[in-house]
Amino acid sequence: VASDISYAKVRSGLYYFLRCFANDVLAFMLRGGYAHNAPKYLYPYTIGRYEKGKRHSVPNDEDAYSMRGFTKDEYYGNRLAVAIVEYRIPLVQKDMGYKLVPLLFRDLWLTPFAEYGNIWVGETDIHDFNYSFGSELHLRITAGYHVDIEGFLGVVKGYGDYGETQVYFGVATVFEGALKQHTIIRDAIYN
């Protein structure tokens, strides 16, 4: 099968984890991507990760490099740069089960974060970059003695073009999504 379209894309990430206090972790992440000669309808990067009211599988491609707190599929570009700082705070780290029930609570942790980044076509300026602040609550359990299941619930506020307040959730490696009702989110944040 031949094609008249020929383009290349590359993406990469740099991650650094610094242990703080007992088991707290400060995480620094830089992510970048570039698509060379891609036609406009094949631009791979979008600024947002979640679409309100939609559930989908956990992203494992370019979507995983997107920012939280921004509308998904509003704008695409052929260049991407995102910096993330997370502080991972363990709230409970204790294996707890009940008698012989095959369900084990492993740990619970809180992750406040800040993200700064942009996608663009051609040239950009530092003033075009967007940022977001949010927090996630993570839970890990073991079911059936050997299946680890991670879940998370988060809230984030994006600032800049296409920024919005999002409440999102996920079961790691299975699915994730965002709440649809804007009034529920506003009431939860501002009351």
Where in this protein do the model-derived segments appear?
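Outer-membrane beta-barrel "beta-signal"
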Residues: G134-S135, E164-N191
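Residue-level signature of outer-membrane beta-barrel architecture
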Residues: Y16-L18, Y87-I89, L139-I141, K157, ...
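C-terminal outer-membrane beta-barrel translocator/porin domains of Gram-negative envelope proteins
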Residues: V1-L104, W120, A178-N191
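Outer-membrane beta-barrel transmembrane domain signature
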Residues: N23, W109-P112, Y116-F133, T142
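Flexible, surface-exposed loop regions and adjacent strand-edge segments
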Residues: Y43-E51, D128-N130, Y168-A172
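Short beta-alpha connecting loops at secondary-structure transitions
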Residues: S66-R68, E150-G158, T165-V167
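Membrane-embedded beta-strand positions of outer-membrane beta-barrel proteins
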Residues: L14, F28-G32, V85, L110-A114, ...
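Membrane-interface anchoring segments and C-terminal beta-barrel signals
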Residues: H127-E150, K157-Y162
